[in-house]
Amino acid sequence: MNDSYFEEMTFQCAAYERAKKERAERKAQIAEARGYDSPEMDAWYAEEKAAGPYPYSGGEMKAYWVYKMRRENDGDEFEMSDYCWDKEFHDFIETLRKLGITEFTITNKSTALMENIYGFIAEGCTMVGTHTITKKSLRWGEEEYETAQGILFKVN
């Protein structure tokens, strides 16, 4: 696993969120002091546009959360409990590769599951078969373990 790539993603996301929060606070101050039709607000909008989009795509962030949840839950396996949209497959799988993840289990039970299976295969993954994972969960302040059924994929 590539902890350094994960740490870099964590750092970049935190920096973006801090800057976004500061800009939002500054916008509120400008609106209060000068109003929305002021030159200061125009400058704020230009700054907001220059800040650019979030540093990572939706697919990259889903891979990040797969990695993060495994670390936080002291798990042995990577679980994808969400689903990918069509535009997210490539970035999701590429980020898993960068993170050094060689297999994951999708446990999502949505109607998009079939599309996700085909999307992962199209990105070069191999469907291994059904797989049950055990994961730690926190319920009512108590840690307990539960199982989840899913489909195991190898990231090639």
Regions inferred by a protein language model and the residue ranges of each:
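Short, aromatic/basic amphipathic alpha-helical patches
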Residues: 113-128
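N-terminal leader/targeting segments
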Residues: 1-115
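C-terminal edge-of-domain segments
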Residues: 126-156
